[in-house]
Amino acid sequence: MSAHRGAIQNSGFQTSVDIARQQPFAVAPLAGQKRPPSGALDEETNNPSSHAINGTSRQNLPTGQGLDFNRPQVHLPKSRLIASEICTVSGSEKEQKPRPDDPSKSQGSLQSLNDPRFGLPPALVANFAAAGVTSIYQWQASCLLGEGLLKGKRHLIYTAPTGGGKSLVADVLMLKRIIENPTRKAILVLPYVALVQEKLKWLRRIVQDVEKFAVDDGDPDPSHHRWRRMQKSIRISGFFGGSKTTASWDDTDIAVCTIEKANSLINTAIEECSIGELGAVVLDELHMLDDEHRGYLLELMVTKLLLLQQDIQIIGMSATISNTELLADWINARYFVSTYRPVPVDEYLIYDNAIYPAATSRQLFQTMSKLTTTGGPFLSEAVPPQRTIKPSAFRELSNPMSNAMVAMAIDTVTAGYGALVFCGSRVACQVQAALISEAMPDPATLGAEDLGKRLDLLAELRSLPSGLDPALEKTLIKGVGFHNAGMTTEEREAIAQAYDQGVLKVLVATCSLAAGVNLPARRVIINGARMGRELVGPAMLRQMCGRAGRKGKDEAGETYLIVGKSDLQAVCDLLEADMPAIESCLAPEKRGLKRALLEAIATGLVSGVAAIKEYVKCTLLYRTVDKKLSYSIMDSALQELAEEKLIQLNEDESYVATQLGQAVVASAFAPDDGLFVYEELKRALQAFVMDGDMHVFYMFTPLQAAAQTQIDWPTFRDLLDTLDDSGIRALQFVGVNPGFVNSMVQSGASLKEDTPEQVTQARIYRRAYTAFQLRDLSNEVPLPVISSRYKIPRGTIQTLAQQCHGFAAGIVKFCQRMGWGMLAAVLDHMRDRLEAGARADLLEMAQVTYVKGWTARLLRDNGFRNLRALAEADPKDIVPVLKMVNPRKTQRNQLHPTEAERYAGKLLAKAEIIVASANKIWEREMQVELDE
């Protein structure tokens, strides 16, 4: 007892900050310490033998430089596997393709951005040059100089291979339009948030210090000078789900948007009669017109713009469409087709450890079929491959596809290049990345600088609130990363940047990376041609292959498609398939025309039957189906909208949107989703459960996110058991029966969706289950805990939170348009909590960068009780609290001092940003109080 008392007296009163300061750094080791099969492997690992890319001799990786070499003192894992050797088959030398000339060396000034024909201001040309664009290719110049394009008088549809410079043409046309017409705006539409964020950075860099051609009014007043300069500058804003921008249509010159946000912006501009300010619309990835989920929104946008007949230039581009002429005819545009690739790409097929040129794939399959029926010689004897991969003695590489993948990846790295590996699922990403990392060269052979960069990457990921993924921890130190939708945004960005900068040598990704992120590689390896269970389409395959070859770094690129026996015929057909023709998504089975007509009527674009017919004539649907059929579809859609009370027919035979129809359009819901939300909200008005928050979380659960949710019924039952009276009443009120949940647990059955009633019931239960995840997010439960509780990836939860922000805003706007002001006010308050990921008492602190949810609560509990306290804090005092954000990392083995120092450095940098952000917000609030 006395011993205990002495310990207490010596320590005194300790806060959690004091305890955190005393804790040693303890995290999982950098990689698993699996022992190699034999001691001989350690000697062989450093001298793998394989074929170098394009005959290039191997470049040895950096090694230590003597006794005085100061390298990080960390325990590094050794390679456990040895990649198989790649051998060239005698008599099949690789044909050398002629490389294209540098565009700046041909056709003189025509290919220079300084050419007066382009009419670009010197500041813009200088910014392009600073970004590495000093000249353009002949096809780009020919396209830009097409009649009426640079003056904005003609629309343009064009195609070019991935990496061929498509975006530059649209950038030049759009920027020229904005610079020369200071009162006009532009909208740039991209399909994915990652692409929007990437484009925002690029455009802001390009337009820095570039001014619009504004007329000088001669006002000598110096106080007006700054205002005039602001008016001349080009303002670029991003509009996408989960963005925190406060910019509006009036605050921007170029709006970089996702498809949904762009459609909403155009609807608002039409409704407010400000559409005349729009000067250009750029549609990147135009093949998305054909997407069954979002394509119809692109067609809606273009149709509305065509009907308006305003002076708006439409520019559409894609690498994977075949009916360019039809699309150009639809919008009365010039069209241009380029097949030029600045970096040539060689394509290969790998089957049964043999490498064949992709051009011989059909011959390969035909020969294999004959051998199967006749029992002839080995395939490699009948159709000699260009190269072969030796079978592996390692059990993990006994599968020829895995053996080929590892061999090709290691061969690329050993030659000094980067490899991008595509696979069919999230789980496969992690498994294959781990497999490749086991055969990578030992980190001990790296120089201090390269090893330091990898350790910095580990420290950066370790400092995130979600912590460092154990699977990534094992592969990153070996130079291998993976990238999929199950990861958080911060993880994906850090991994992508590290690969782009050469810190990581191999990146294993799902197929969606090819469309969503621009990460080229010297060699692209496609391990199987399936995405999940489905075979990828020709367009997706082209996009993956198009990532091969990095302009400015590589003079060539290569793609390798690894295929198994069961898929060989399908892959042969795939390699020979043409790009799919784009079709309209307004067809009856896709129900897109209902939304198209509702939006046009609600925004006042059309009303009478004659005007509606003119509107239908502007659709792609009208160009691709029989004219009578298109009008028949129109009549059916109008009748459905009227029956659903979204529109009504006036006595003068004109249509007008009802209050419900206006609310559906204003909130950016599809008609069917809007009707479901209406019924839910109408029921909530009768008895909204106000003594808890479960009812609000249910209402804010996005319909699309819930539709993709797989319910874990035992977890659902456990969650219901934890609810208080208020929560149970709220869920029972919306239609959740705890008894039904128990029966699903006992039976192990899945939800039936055979009838409309069953579909509605399934939607309710999925939304209720997803609402628990939103509740946890808003109640400051750490992301890893939520991920473990619901058995779903952290990235999925983060995506849910981002989707929820947009959906919640739509719900609030819906209530406002319906005149339900009190309900809108209640929901709007809870929307702030959702965005902050915290309870009401932390909303002010949650405005600060890096301070969200659990982090905000820890700061408050450890003395930083408000915004002012954060603003006045010493960053060093915040670091111990940041160490507590991810406690599971402090319960394992100690970090080596070198790693601990890097980790602490990352946390200190974040603490400094937190203090600076808090200061900025605090000063702004004080200024508002002074002004009042």
Q: What would you call each of these model-derived segments?
A:
Residues 1-157, 212-227, 344, 438, ...:
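Helicase-associated low-complexity/disordered flanking segments
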Residues 111, 825-932:
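Compact, charge-rich alpha-helical regulatory domains located at protein termini
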Residues 197-200, 204-237, 422, 426-501, ...:
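Conserved C-terminal RecA-like helicase domain
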Residues 303, 313-435, 481:
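Conserved interdomain linker/interface between the two RecA-like ATPase lobes of SF2 helicase motors
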Residues 519, 523, 530-574:
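Conserved segment of the helicase C-terminal RecA-like domain
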Residues 599, 635-644, 648-853:
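C-terminal helical accessory/scaffold domains
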